[in-house]
Regions:
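Structural motif corresponding to the early beta-alpha repeats
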Residues: 30-152, 156, 164
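Histidine-acidic metal/acid-base catalytic patches
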Residues: 2-4, 9, 15-19, 52-53, ...
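Short loop/turn motifs enriched for small/polar and acidic residues
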Residues: 66, 106, 174, 211, ...
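Short secondary-structure capping/turn micro-motifs that flank functional sites
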Residues: 26, 34-35, 67-68, 109-110, ...
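Non-cysteine beta-strand/loop elements that form the S-adenosyl-L-methionine
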Residues: 23-29, 60-63, 103, 130, ...
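N-terminal ordered "arm"
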Residues: 12-14, 18-35
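A short alpha-helix capping/helix-coil boundary motif
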Residues: 25-28, 66-70, 136-139, 174-175, ...
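Surface-exposed cleft-lining segments at the edges of enzyme active sites
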Residues: 135-150, 176-186, 251-252
């Protein structure tokens, strides 16, 4: 597997720490300020060069920039304009080393939690979700069939360009994978639905981000899901994380303290021949950190990456 980590596009101490931990590749959130143009070759190249100069190879873009993706998911009057920007971005990404776009299809509200201060081991903070505490604007609404239609429309437009340039689309499950969040329908909520999604436009360039904690929240068998999608060579990217609880009430955990057998999960990836990027995700906020960005603070990443490296070495699964 390729050891990667998630970074904002501006240099930070996390870049240096990642290098010190042996991280080789970057999962990049592209700038979303008004000065950055995702269709401008010089702008995209400049972001790539920042990482290359730091010794991190850009490999995954995550997420699809919200400036375009929100319109695509809603299917509003700026959808075609937004898809055109994605089509222009794809060859620019390919020219600068990016091979994968990790994208979700949650309309209006992205990944959602009801707390960022759930107490985990030793008082560390993790994110949590309790449906009883969810507070979604009732004016936000989209139905299931519209989402399926919009996803198909998007994939039919972009997959041919992805095939041309060797870029892959890795669909991320909905988080949490509820059938509805408020009045917002969700579709990437089960193994069956995710299989349906990647079958909409059959292509070697359309697959999934195996965010394994989402499959756990679905109530799916995580190991069977890895085997199922792995047999098809449809796992393009792995989010290595875990939870404790049920679909309607769960919290994130330390990577060694959840409900999934993480050794067995890694063995499933290994046995499936997965050789793509993996990153730890949604790490605990540790003592002394300010929790400004729950799930993405610094010290917990050090622990999670070290844990992942140790497990991989123990089962003879090379990380590079």
């Amino acid at each position: 597997m390729i050891l990667s980590d998630y970074f904002l596009s501006a240099p930070s101490v996390q870049w240096q720490l990642a290098k010190q931990l042996g991280v080789s590749h970057a999962v990049v959130r592209l700038p979303e300020d008004a000065e950055f143009d995702m269709t401008n070759a010089a702008h995209v190249k400049a972001v790539a060069q920042r990482f290359q100069n730091a010794g991190l190879a850009p490999l995954v873009v995550e997420p699809m920039p919200n400036s375009v993706h929100d319109h695509i998911k809603r299917g509003d009057d700026r959808r075609d304009e937004s898809i055109e920007k994605v089509l222009k971005m794809i060859p620019l990404l390919a020219a600068n080393g990016w091979k994968i776009i990790c994208t979700n299809f949650m309309a209006e509200v992205g990944w959602y939690r009801t707390t960022g201060t759930f107490p985990e081991r030793g008082g560390a903070y993790v994110t949590g979700f309790d449906l009883r505490d969810a507070n979604i604007d009732p004016a936000l609404s989209i139905d299931e069939q519209t989402l399926w239609d919009n996803l198909r429309y998007f994939l039919k437009a972009v997959i041919p360009e992805c095939e041309k340039w060797g870029v892959k689309i890795a669909l991320h499950p909905d988080d949490p994978p509820l059938k509805k969040l408020g009045n917002l329908s969700r579709i990437l909520i089960s193994r069956e639905n995710i299989q349906k999604a990647i079958d909409l436009v059959p292509s070697p360039n359309l697959g999934i981000t195996m965010c394994q904690a989402n499959f756990a929240a679905m109530g799916e068998n995580v190991y069977e899901c890895i085997e199922h999608f792995g047999r098809q060579n449809k796992i393009f990217f792995v989010h290595f994380r875990d939870i404790s609880g049920t679909l309607e009430c769960f919290h994130e955990t330390f990577h060694d303290n959840g409900q999934t057998d993480m050794v067995r999960a890694l063995e499933c990836y290994r046995d499936a021949g997965f050789d793509g990027p993996v990153r730890t995700d949604h790490v605990p906020t540790m003592a002394g950190e300010n929790n400004d960005c729950p799930g993405y603070e610094c010290i917990g990443r050090l622990y999670a990456i070290g844990y992942l490296r140790g497990l991989a070495e123990a089962i003879g699964y090379p990380l590079y």
